[in-house]
Amino acid sequence: AFVQFKGFTLGQAWSTFGDMTAVPTTIDEEGPSSGIEIRQPMLRYTYHINDRWQSSLALEYAKASYTTGKNAESIRQKVPDIPLNIRYTMKNGSHVQVGAILRNIGYKNVVKDKDKIRTGWGVMGSGKLNITSSTSFLFQAEYGKGIANYIQDISGIGYDLIPTADDNGNLKAPGMWGLFGAFQHNWNPKLYSTITYSYARLEARGSLEGDTYKYAQYAGANLLWNFTEFGTTGIEYVFGRRNNFNHDYGNASRINAMIQYRF
């Protein structure tokens, strides 16, 4: 929950680093593997420059998720994440957005008995382009170091910081990136489809095991029907492939179905 007043947002809301209006509609709750879809406590200010431009700056409390190894320990995070973005909205309702984030992630080096900070950072670009009155293209790409918490597929599993290869108590912020693209087509006022492809990648594993996540691909297609003003039903096919650093991989296919009624 959050409250808004004169451009300020206080409470738990979607991260300022992301762009939820560029995320494609899926039945799958997780959505694209590279999506930036996280809600966190924040204080945000949004400034409407004019009818076309707006910008936001925030302080957000994010739970760092890192792997300590044998010679490091987790500590309480003292510095909030600082994301910002700027958006341009076109006359036809299309928009593009760019954003950046700065993180200071604290941990304890047990060998040196000293608290340390690693700086994480990230940049992103996203948008929704209305190609015709019934077809839109949605996209997003991001790159950074120490921003695993923000990337859907690797959020919360210990990749914001990882032990260095020598595991001497130092942690590093590995590079990571992702992208997705999706077409959404309205067949008529009540029937629509989305086709999505997404890719997410971790660039280094430090001293983590060989079965650590390296990259994954995600693809899906659906057909949704708004059978009333408040009701939606649909069916969806999703395919996923994960590759590890040791070259092991796995594929999975799934059929999702949904009936939703909004009160």
Each model region followed by its residue ranges:
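Outer membrane beta-barrel
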Residues: 1-65, 78, 83, 87-91, ...
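Repeated loop/turn-to-beta-strand initiation elements of outer-membrane beta-barrel proteins
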Residues: 6-10, 51-57, 93-97, 134-137, ...
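Transmembrane beta-strands of outer-membrane beta-barrel pores
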Residues: 7, 12-16, 59-65, 90, ...
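Detector for outer-membrane/organellar transmembrane beta-barrel domains
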Residues: 89-207, 212-213
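Outer-membrane beta-barrel architecture
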Residues: 2, 44-46, 85-87, 124-128, ...
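Outer-membrane beta-barrel "beta-signal"
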Residues: 225-227, 250-263
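Residues that define the transmembrane beta-barrel architecture of outer-membrane proteins
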Residues: 37-41, 78-82, 117-123, 173-177, ...
